[in-house]
Curated annotation (Swiss-Prot):
Gene of this entry: ruvA
Quaternary structure and interacting proteins, as annotated: Homotetramer. Forms an RuvA(8)-RuvB(12)-Holliday junction (HJ) complex. HJ DNA is sandwiched between 2 RuvA tetramers; dsDNA enters through RuvA and exits via RuvB. An RuvB hexamer assembles on each DNA strand where it exits the tetramer. Each RuvB hexamer is contacted by two RuvA subunits (via domain III) on 2 adjacent RuvB subunits; this complex drives branch migration. In the full resolvosome a probable DNA-RuvA(4)-RuvB(12)-RuvC(2) complex forms which resolves the HJ.
Main subcellular localisation: cytoplasm
Described function: The RuvA-RuvB-RuvC complex processes Holliday junction (HJ) DNA during genetic recombination and DNA repair, while the RuvA-RuvB complex plays an important role in the rescue of blocked DNA replication forks via replication fork reversal (RFR). RuvA specifically binds to HJ cruciform DNA, conferring on it an open structure. The RuvB hexamer acts as an ATP-dependent pump, pulling dsDNA into and through the RuvAB complex. HJ branch migration allows RuvC to scan DNA until it finds its consensus sequence, where it cleaves and resolves the cruciform DNA.
Chain segments carrying region Domain III: 149-200
Highest taxon above the source species: Bacteria
Protein name as it appears in the record: Holliday junction branch migration complex subunit RuvA
Amino acid sequence: MIGHLRGIIVEKQPPYLLLEVAGVGYEITAPLSTFYHLPEPQKEILLYTHLIVREDAHTLYGFHNDHERRLFRALIKVNGVGPKLALAILSGIGPDEFVHCVLNQNIDQLVRIPGVGRKTAERLVIETKDGLSRWHTNDTPSPEGLRSSNTQPTQDAISALMALGYKPQEAKRAIDAIQKPDLSAETLIRLALKQMVLGT
């Protein structure tokens, strides 16, 4: 098992990034809660990782800290929740907000996440509540996000939302509703998700 990787960010386009470690490029899938903390390309970063091996693919998931990774591991143990949905949860509302929803049994907010129906939301609460009762990260991502090196942050943001399970029309409508110029892709995604999932 690969526990963590320290290397240079070559490319980043949510939910994927390319990390070069000792001359080897690792393609890593990460939640948006991790992307909010990533530096610019060509900068060094340490990512905690989780490797999932299947017959058709070996997929490496990366996380800003061990708290995120532990929550991801708890999520994929829930019946009906796979890695893709676990990433959508971490991307949609973030670790702390998810824990708050679980501990307060806020089913209505959980079902706003793409792919999470009422039954899945109820299972998330039932199967993770005990383990999350002492959860604290004390790690709030920057509300401004990080500047994307890509010259098309709007399109990158729409693509990232689609990768999370939103329909193209929903993704475009959410991004278009943000009337703020010169924002990075990460910030656009964060604001769009805040509106769609949290309703604020």
